[in-house]
């Protein structure tokens, strides 16, 4: 939920955006505004991997044998770079011209399908070595702490301080809402509201509420992801300590 999910996601009826717009007599308007604040004109939402899968992939980086993991890591990195599209235009143009079949892709984000397969595979390699008992307990616990620290720490950072690290599209929302309120006032012969700067004042208040709702969505998702990571890490730790039988 970092970027507001997908283009069609709207603000909740019990959120701050809805409360502000309700005060302006625009009841239900929040459910017509997109919570997405990314740069794509349309998106069906981010590629889903799952927090536990990412944690296990990090564990795989620490535990999987080099010959098995490096090609998976390389594939993930290259596919993510390709998915950046115009944000890494030089690399995108190179791939478009010289990578066979790449110019047939409908969107650059299609490359993330490879990541969806590679990340669980990396986690599976870690679980396979764990199940076979090939890893000394001390090394396993160190790797477990590292993987949980990296992935869980990132979630904790976003949950605690993420609201102050990003603007959540506030500036763009303020511009958009200024135009929207101005159009509403002009359409209803309320020119005096524009003369008093009410279009800008209302837009700023609405943009603040929109950013707050987006930040709340991100924090909730970060806390939820942290819980999933801790549960997965706890399961692996119990297995490592022989508290869970390998055949369970």
Model segments located where?
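Contiguous transmembrane helix-bundle modules in multi-pass membrane proteins
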Residues: 64-248
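Individual transmembrane alpha-helix segments
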Residues: 1-56, 210-227
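Extended surface/linker regions that mediate inter-domain or inter-protein docking
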Residues: 57-63
């Amino acid at each position: 939920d970092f970027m507001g999910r997908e283009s069609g996601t709207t603000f909740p009826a019990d959120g701050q955006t809805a409360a502000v717009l309700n005060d302006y007599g625009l009841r239900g308007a929040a459910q017509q505004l997109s919570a997405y604040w990314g740069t794509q004109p349309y998106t069906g939402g981010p590629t889903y991997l799952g927090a536990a899968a990412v944690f296990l992939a990090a564990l795989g980086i620490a535990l999987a044998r080099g010959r098995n993991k490096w090609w998976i890591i390389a594939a993930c990195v290259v596919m993510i770079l390709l998915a950046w599209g115009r944000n890494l235009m030089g690399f995108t143009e190179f791939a478009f011209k010289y990578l066979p079949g790449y110019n047939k892709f409908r969107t650059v984000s299609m490359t993330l399908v490879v990541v969806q397969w590679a990340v669980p595979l990396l986690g599976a390699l870690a679980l396979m070595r764990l199940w076979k008992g090939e890893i000394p307990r001390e090394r396993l616990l160190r790797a477990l702490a590292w993987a949980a620290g990296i992935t869980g720490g990132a979630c904790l950072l976003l949950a605690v301080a993420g609201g102050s690290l990003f603007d959540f599209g506030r500036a763009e929302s303020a511009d958009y809402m200024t135009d929207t309120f101005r159009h509403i006032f002009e359409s209803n012969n309320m020119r005096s509201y524009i003369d008093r700067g009410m279009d800008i004042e209302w837009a700023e208040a609405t943009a603040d509420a929109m950013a707050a709702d987006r930040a709340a969505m991100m924090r909730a998702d970060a806390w939820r992801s942290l819980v999933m990571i801790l549960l997965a890490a706890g399961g692996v730790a119990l297995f490592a300590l022989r508290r869970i039988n390998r055949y369970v």
